[in-house]
Structure formats: structure tokens, C-alpha cells
Amino acid sequence: MPQTINTNLVSLNAQRNLSMSQSQLGTAMQRLSSGMRVNSAKDDAAGLAIAERMNTQVKGMTVAMRNANDGISLAQVGEGALGSVGSLFQRMRELAVQSANGTNSSSDRISLNQEFIQLSQEATRTLGGTKFNGLGILATTNDAIFQIGANSNSDVDRLTVTAFDWAANTSINSVLGSTVLSGTGTPTLQITDTPNAQSAISAIDTAIDAINAQRANFGAVQNRFENIVNNMQVAVENQSAARSRIMDADYAAETSALSRANILQQAGNAMVAQANQLPQQVLSLLKG
């Protein structure tokens, strides 16, 4: 290598290597301090794009899980209310069976019928007043649509819970009658004599079947939502793990990189200092 004064190639090379080691040291320190392997797009452009898409999915699925849990709550509220109505109908049936007995006097049947009417009105109030977040559950013609996925695919990411309008259910309506609208009126079905009581028994049996069918539907919906939540939790876990492998810093590897960069930094500083002294050797030639 020729000896020159104006251009110190050895020093330039040492400075370039020192700059590289400084950059490596800065990168290692940034990753260790932030906990992230990718702190900007320049660190891993493709990886950042993939990780951000995964992050979008994870956030969407997290919200979808909350939506599904709302569905579970709605089904629980609806099923609980129907359970209460079912108990009221069972008591009404007991009263009808008791009233159908020929040993009852007219005053006995009037007393039985008064309780029967009160229970009918309470059943109507419960059915009409059961709400979830202000929305009627058992007295609505509008299906409840739940967003249970992170995307907009209607077949995969949405679940429709079919509306239940008890007022339109002939089996239940035949028991409650005119109390459907007000909750305080006199029901069409009464137990003031044996024939009416026997008719009431048959009508209530049919109404109880309708109540139980809808309770079973709510139970099935609840189970489905629970499975959706469980599957979503697994998906979130896997997506988060995949994103972590791209974005998160490996502390063992980064600590090793930091130590290496520190050593190179110290060695580079020493070599630059020595390289800057090389032009001084030209003076020995001039003195000769």
C-alpha cells in the first residue's frame, strides 16, 4: 500500500467499521430498552407489515370475543326469564287442576281464579319486560345479529339469533290472552268452572312446551357462543405468538449482540487512533 499524506485509506476503513459497530451498538441498545426487535420499518419492512396485519386480527378477535360474551349474557337473561315464566305456568296448572275438582265451591273457584289471573299478569309482565341493554329479548320481531369474527364475511364472522316474540306465539297467547298488551287485563283463559279449568290444563301444557322449546334454543345458543369464545381465545393466542416471534426482542441474542458491538466499538476507536498516526511515518522518509 503506498504511503500518502492527503488520503489515509486505513483511517477511512477504520472509521467505516467504527460507524458500523456504532450502528449495531445503537440497534442492540434500542431493542433491549424497548423489548422490540422491530422498532421501525427499516428494521424489518416485511416483518412489520405481517405483524401489523396479525395485530389487526388480534384486536378484532378480542372485540369479537366481547361480542360473543354479550351473546352468552343475552341468552342467559332470556333463558332465566323463561324459566321464571315456566314456574308461573306450572303454578297456574296446579290451580287449574285444583279448580277442576268437583268438590270446590263457587267461592273456592273464585279464589283460585284470582291467583290464576295474578300469575297470568305477572307472566305477561316478565315476558314483555325482559330486556338486555335496553333491547327486548322475548317480545321482539328483530333478529339479533352478533359480530363474532374479526372480518366482514357475513357467513363466517356473524351469527344471527332468531327473534322470539311471545305475543305472536299462539300457545303462550292462548294462556295469557288479553294481558298480552297491558299486563293488567283479564286473561281469556280462566278457571271459574270445571270445563274452563280442564281447557286451561291443556292450554298450559302446550304453552309450557313452547316455553321449554325456547329455553332449549337459548341454551343451544349459549353453548355455541361459549365454543366461539373458546376457539377465538386459541386463535388470539396463536396469532399473538406468531406476532411475538416477529416483533419481540430475543434478550439472549440481543445481549450477545450488545457485548459484541461494545468490543468492536472499543477496538474501532483504538484502530482509528492508530490509523491517524500512519501519515507521520512519511516524515521519516523526508528526514532520511
Features from the language model and the residues they span:
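Primary detection of the long, small/polar-rich alpha-helical "axial" segments characteristic
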Residues: 1-288
